[in-house]
């Protein structure tokens, strides 16, 4: 943590094709070893596949997927009197977005075979339909928060 006050958040520029800041964040998450042009081709390729398969605006499908994956609650470890409690806390909007994008890309990478474009497109379409690994991760996170509701009074 810095001693000289809070570090300002860097503003993300909207992507050149869809003019969406969230899509830029997805591109940055997909990017490995600084290869941004490759990450852009993967994401835009996935968007083309989504448009081809669904016949809908790919940005709307992506936004639906994001809504279905963004968690409302998560658990944080809190140490009280020698015991660690999993305390449920609400998730801020920017963290919701970050977690959703991270889960989408991670579960897309874990999918079997094919190119990353196809895997990402399939994960986004599954998330928009309410299925897929990323949606399951959100549901598991919510179940953990629900199971530990008794420790909610330890919030800070």
From Swiss-Prot:
GO biological process: translation
Any one GO molecular function term: tRNA binding
Name the record gives this protein: Small ribosomal subunit protein uS7
Family: Belongs to the universal ribosomal protein uS7 family.
Organism for this UniProt entry: Pelotomaculum thermopropionicum (strain DSM 13744 / JCM 10971 / SI)
Cellular-component GO terms for this entry: small ribosomal subunit
Function: One of the primary rRNA binding proteins, it binds directly to 16S rRNA where it nucleates assembly of the head domain of the 30S subunit. Is located at the subunit interface close to the decoding center, probably blocks exit of the E-site tRNA.
Matches recorded under InterPro entries: Ribosomal_uS7, Ribosomal_uS7_bac/org-type, Ribosomal_uS7_CS, Ribosomal_uS7_dom, Ribosomal_uS7_dom_sf
Keyword vocabulary terms for this entry: Ribonucleoprotein, Ribosomal protein, RNA-binding, rRNA-binding, tRNA-binding
Subunit structure: Part of the 30S ribosomal subunit. Contacts proteins S9 and S11.
């Amino acid at each position: 943590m810095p001693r000289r006050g809070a570090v300002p958040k860097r503003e993300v520029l909207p992507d050149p094709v869809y003019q969406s800041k969230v899509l830029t964040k997805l591109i940055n998450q997909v990017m490995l070893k600084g290869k941004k042009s490759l990450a852009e081709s993967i994401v835009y390729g996935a968007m083309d596949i989504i448009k081809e398969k669904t016949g809908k605006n790919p940005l709307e499908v992506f936004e639906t997927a994001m809504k279905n994956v963004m968690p409302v609650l998560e658990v944080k470890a809190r140490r009280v009197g020698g015991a660690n409690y999993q305390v449920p806390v609400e998730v801020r909007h920017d963290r919701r977005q970050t977690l959703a994008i991270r889960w989408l890309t991670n579960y897309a990478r874990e999918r079997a075979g094919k190119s990353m474009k196809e895997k990402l497109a399939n994960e986004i379409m599954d998330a928009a339909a309410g299925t897929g690994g990323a949606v399951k991760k959100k549901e598991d996170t919510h179940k953990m928060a629900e199971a530990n509701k008794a420790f909610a009074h330890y919030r800070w």
